[in-house]
């Protein structure tokens, strides 16, 4: 992706970072519609081990459990998954009886892993699809935005548009990488890692940590009901034997450690595992953070 001017990181007034200038809409559409899932970019892979699939299903289950604790989610409630990817979260709520809709640039991921959801899937530009939803007057009880906000050129506009399609008691669930975190600062300051590995243009265009995300959401009229972490895989970087940034060959085994650890702990008690990750989320520790939000009354 070529630009006349090299993109640079700019800190916003809310504390999160964005690239400037941004890639064009055409470049991004081509990237996501034709390259992202098919070539295994980001966290996506053309194939997964059975234990990895169990891990993805577990993460979706944890999101459902927490959402049901915070909101009276009934069968038949309307859910929209904006940027539904391979469909793991969408499928979890579908199995619970919700009326689901999914949007994404590409159908490749959902077609491969959850083809039964294609009936509820709409492919194209997510901003255009949200506008169509608004023009149809549809309001949702649950809105999922999982690992999407970091990819879009206008995250602020996206949050404004989402708010318009939320019902009065709706729940917005945002999953985002926890970047420029306190842990990342220490890893860089102590030279434990040689580079800011989380920077990945044009895949991620904005970078949030707990504080900056809460600043942004609060400023646009959202109440943050809970912040929940996922596995803090970055803590492995403190150990030279599992420093997958210095030695990328250690990455696969470290990832599988995360997968097996979470699957094992969930088998013992999934509710207690959720409690662990709620504690870490409150501390701002975790590779991803999940924000459960409602509209301020």
List each language-model region with its residue ranges.
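Conserved N-terminal segment of class I S-adenosyl-L-methionine
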Residues: 1-146, 155-159, 229, 254-265, ...
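S-adenosyl-L-methionine-dependent methyltransferase catalytic module, highlighting the catalytic core
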Residues: 145, 153-161, 171-292
């Amino acid at each position: 992706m070529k630009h006349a001017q090299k993109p640079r990181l700019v800190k916003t007034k809310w504390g999160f970072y964005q690239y400037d200038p941004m890639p064009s809409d055409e470049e991004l559409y081509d990237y996501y519609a034709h390259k992202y899932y098919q070539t295994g970019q980001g966290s996506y892979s053309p194939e997964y081990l059975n234990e990895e699939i169990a891990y993805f299903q577990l993460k979706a289950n944890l999101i459902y459990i927490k959402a049901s604790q915070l909101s009276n989610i009934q069968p038949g409630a309307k859910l929209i998954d904006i940027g539904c990817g391979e469909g793991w979260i969408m499928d979890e709520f579908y199995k619970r009886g919700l009326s689901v809709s999914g949007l994404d640039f590409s159908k490749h991921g959902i077609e491969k892993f959850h083809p039964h959801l294609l009936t509820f899937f709409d492919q194209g530009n997510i901003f255009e699809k949200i506008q169509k939803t608004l023009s149809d007057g549809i309001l949702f009880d649950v809105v999922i935005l999982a690992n999407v906000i970091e990819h879009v050129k206008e995250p602020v506009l996206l949050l404004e548009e989402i708010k318009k399609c939320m019902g009065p008691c709706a729940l917005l669930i945002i999953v985002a990488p926890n970047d420029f975190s306190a842990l990342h600062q220490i890893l860089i300051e102590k030279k434990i890692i040689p580079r800011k590995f989380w920077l990945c243009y044009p895949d991620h265009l904005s970078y949030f940590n707990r504080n900056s995300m809460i600043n942004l959401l609060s400023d646009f009229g959202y109440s943050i009901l809970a912040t929940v972490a996922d596995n803090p895989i970055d803590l492995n970087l403190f150990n030279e034997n599992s420093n997958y940034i210095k030695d990328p060959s250690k990455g696969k085994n470290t990832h599988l450690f995360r997968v097996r650890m979470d699957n094992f702990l969930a088998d013992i008690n999934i509710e207690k595992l959720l409690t662990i990750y709620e504690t870490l989320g409150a501390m701002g520790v975790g590779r991803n953070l999940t924000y459960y939000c409602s509209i301020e009354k």
